């Protein structure tokens, strides 16, 4: 099996397939993603989310903010299972979604845990991480604000944020409050989308 042109092991493929089946089942009862995207689950969500790990395939500690339906947090945790290292802390305040995430991690034997708390409170439970991810949560300025407790003054912590066609405007807005190094990874799934890699964060105002 290939995702975004990269080979995926049979074990990881089976985990992803089990997650997809579980997702479809739970999505009938709770709103995990926009219903209009369910028919394109593999391309729109699983392949898209896989890009984060494919950009940074290291056995490290992640914090995934606003994990929702598990994109990209659970997908990253599934890939980490193959490496037998690293961990994903999934932060999701909605208790129904958090219950789904716990079930998904358990049934796929993925490397992660769920913190059913507000994003603003997550740093009190998870003090250290090497990478932060978020998808379809808020604009870049807001994401950097949420991530700042882990990233400010820490050269080894990076943010990986999925962004759509308005990402240049979001970058300009964020640079009004923050100074940071930036890499733009063009999406292999959506032509006008990117994954923004943020590092060396400093506060301006």
Curated annotation (Swiss-Prot):
Coiled coil: none annotated. Keywords: Cytoplasm, Methyltransferase, rRNA processing, S-adenosyl-L-methionine, Transferase. GO terms for cellular component: cytosol. Its EC number is 2.1.1.170. Disulfide bonds: none annotated. It is found in: Cytoplasm. Its main location: cytoplasm. S-adenosyl-L-methionine binds at residues 66, 71, 119-120, 135. It catalyses: guanosine(527) in 16S rRNA + S-adenosyl-L-methionine = N(7)-methylguanosine(527) in 16S rRNA + S-adenosyl-L-homocysteine. Belongs to the methyltransferase superfamily. RNA methyltransferase RsmG family. This is Ribosomal RNA small subunit methyltransferase G. It comes from Rhizobium johnstonii (strain DSM 114642 / LMG 32736 / 3841) (Rhizobium leguminosarum bv. viciae). The gene is rsmG.
């Amino acid at each position: 099996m290939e995702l975004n042109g990269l080979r995926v092991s049979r074990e990881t493929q089976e985990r992803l397939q089990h997650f997809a089946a579980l997702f479809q089942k739970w999505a009938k009862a709770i709103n995990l993603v926009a219903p209009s995207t369910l028919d394109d689950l593999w391309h729109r969500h699983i392949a898209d989310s896989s890009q984060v790990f494919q950009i940074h395939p290291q056995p490290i500690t992640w914090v995934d903010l606003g994990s929702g339906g598990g994109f990209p947090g659970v997908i990253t945790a599934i890939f980490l299972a193959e490496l037998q290292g690293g961990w994903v802390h999934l932060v999701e305040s909605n208790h129904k979604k958090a219950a789904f995430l716990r079930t998904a991690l358990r049934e796929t034997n993925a490397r992660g845990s769920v913190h059913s708390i507000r994003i603003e409170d997550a740093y009190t439970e998870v003090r250290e991480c090497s990478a932060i991810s978020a998808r379809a949560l808020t604009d870049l300025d807001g994401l950097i604000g949420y991530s700042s407790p882990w990233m400010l003054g820490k050269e080894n912590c990076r943010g990986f944020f999925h962004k759509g066609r308005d990402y240049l405007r979001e970058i300009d807005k964020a640079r009004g409050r923050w100074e940071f190094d930036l890499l733009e990874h063009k999406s292999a799934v959506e032509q006008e989308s990117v994954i923004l890699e943020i590092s060396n964060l400093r506060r301006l105002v």
